[in-house]
UniProtKB/Swiss-Prot annotation:
<dbReference type="GO" id="GO:0009073">
    <property type="term" value="P:aromatic amino acid family biosynthetic process"/>
</dbReference>
<dbReference type="InterPro" id="IPR000453">
    <property type="entry name" value="Chorismate_synth"/>
</dbReference>
<comment type="function">
    <text>This reaction introduces a second double bond into the aromatic ring system.</text>
</comment>
<dbReference type="Pfam" id="PF01264">
    <property type="entry name" value="Chorismate_synt"/>
</dbReference>
<feature type="binding site">
    <location>
        <begin position="125"/>
        <end position="127"/>
    </location>
    <ligand>
        <name>FMN</name>
    </ligand>
</feature>
<keyword id="KW-0521">NADP</keyword>
<feature type="binding site">
    <location>
        <position position="319"/>
    </location>
    <ligand>
        <name>FMN</name>
    </ligand>
</feature>
<keyword id="KW-0274">FAD</keyword>
<dbReference type="GO" id="GO:0010181">
    <property type="term" value="F:FMN binding"/>
</dbReference>
<feature type="binding site">
    <location>
        <begin position="238"/>
        <end position="239"/>
    </location>
    <ligand>
        <name>FMN</name>
    </ligand>
</feature>
<feature type="binding site">
    <location>
        <position position="48"/>
    </location>
    <ligand>
        <name>NADP(+)</name>
    </ligand>
</feature>
<comment type="pathway">
    <text>Metabolic intermediate biosynthesis; chorismate biosynthesis; chorismate from D-erythrose 4-phosphate and phosphoenolpyruvate: step 7/7.</text>
</comment>
<keyword id="KW-0057">Aromatic amino acid biosynthesis</keyword>
<keyword id="KW-0028">Amino-acid biosynthesis</keyword>
<comment type="similarity">
    <text>Belongs to the chorismate synthase family.</text>
</comment>
<dbReference type="InterPro" id="IPR020541">
    <property type="entry name" value="Chorismate_synthase_CS"/>
</dbReference>
<dbReference type="InterPro" id="IPR035904">
    <property type="entry name" value="Chorismate_synth_AroC_sf"/>
</dbReference>
Length: 362
């Protein structure tokens, strides 16, 4: 099965299924000499792991990561870093009654048609459980980017269903179960999600992820433009149906005189482009938005077919997220970190001695 590796110089390969024995990753290309422990990865994994609030799946996984290789005496060696997370709370019996049915809106049908065989337990490889390893690998990239380049990455939920953030308070993002940035909306979100769970339904969401301190020059035109690579990374996250950089789809209603980002000697006057011009980072904040669909794993009956093509009706039982956008925040952060780390190494490889007389703006 192809498509399990991401990146060129900083390469991440993941393996494992939702109800398998374990999940794993091999991280190639991490520079040597960086201090690294399992605790450095665990923080982001704890933010993503299931069962941390009543508004996410109640599957209980500790998601404790083990570093198997690539670290000696607390420092990276420059060799492959092996990572492993054991699965401990699989309930495969929840799926035994639907093993011959295709859950509508899921990857069941397409995986079956492509490979002729599929792991029906929790979606197998197509499950968002796989993203735990992306978060672990992304934590390595985030640590290097912050310590060596001053690049920091954070994300937050901007909209859940009809509820939109109307103000931004970064200090509360990590202090509520929604990763929401508007403190005035938390009670409304709580009530909305409680009602949604009673209905047995799900809802979509929009989140934003931002990278600060990114230097000018990252990105490889024309086919590996930085924004193209970011879109590729984000679209690879389960349930993501749309990605925008900067003002994104709002540019449709903007005039050129409004959208362009004027420059003065002391910096840019705006950032409609989201920190990327011509596929290359401009030195401003990189701003990325993601739209995630409502999960199809719901208690509302839906029409489908079985393996023989016979009509059927089904309800998806088991433990599922009523809004997958909530736990997608640390996943999106990780994917942005992987892109920036890869392009940082690629930029150094080709352009480490490039010097211009033009000042670097922010």
């Amino acid at each position: 099965m192809a498509g399990n590796t991401f990146g060129q110089l900083f390469r991440v390969t993941t393996f494992g299924e939702s109800h398998g024995l374990a999940l794993g990753a091999i991280v190639d290309g991490c520079p040597p000499g960086m201090e690294l422990t399992e605790a450095d990865l665990q923080g982001d994994l704890d933010r993503r792991k299931p069962g941390t609030s009543r508004f996410t799946t109640q599957r209980r996984e500790d998601d404790e990561v083990k570093i198997l290789s690539g670290v000696f005496e607390g420092k990276t060696t420059g060799t492959s870093i092996g990572l492993l997370i054991e699965n401990t709370d699989q309930r495969s019996k929840d799926y035994s009654d639907i093993k011959d049915l295709f859950r509508p809106g899921h990857a069941d049908y397409t995986y079956h048609q492509k490979y002729g065989i599929r792991d029906y337990r929790g979606g197998g490889r197509s499950s968002a459980r796989e993203t735990a390893m992306r978060v672990a690998a992304g934590a390595i990239a985030k640590k290097y980017l912050k310590e060596h380049c001053g690049i920091e990455i954070f994300g937050y939920l901007e909209q859940l269903g009809p509820i939109k953030a109307e103000r931004f308070d970064k200090s509360i993002i990590e202090n509520n179960p929604f990763f929401f940035a508007d403190p005035d909306k938390l009670d409304e979100l709580d009530a909305y999600m409680r009602d949604l769970k009673k209905q047995g339904d799900s809802i979509g969401a929009k989140l934003k992820v931002i990278a600060t301190g990114v230097p000018v020059g990252l990105g490889e035109p024309v086919f590996d433009r930085l924004d193209a690579e970011i879109a590729h990374a984000m679209m690879g996250i389960n349930a993501v149906k749309g990605v925008e950089v900067g003002d994104g789809f709002a540019v449709v209603e903007q005039h050129g005189s409004e959208h362009r980002d004027p420059m003065r000697p002391d910096g840019f006057l705006s950032n409609h482009a989201g920190g990327i011009l011509g596929g290359i980072s401009s030195g401003q904040e990189i701003v990325v938005g993601l739209a995630l669909k409502p999960t199809s794993s719901i208690m509302v009956p839906g029409e489908t077919i079985d393996k023989q093509g016979n009509p059927a009706e089904m309800v998806t039982r088991g433990r599922h997220d009523p809004c997958v956008g909530i736990r997608a925040v640390p996943i999106a952060e990780a994917m942005l970190a992987l892109v920036l780390m890869d392009h940082l190494l690629r930029h150094r490889a080709q352009n480490f001695d490039v010097v211009t007389e033009t000042p670097k703006l922010k």
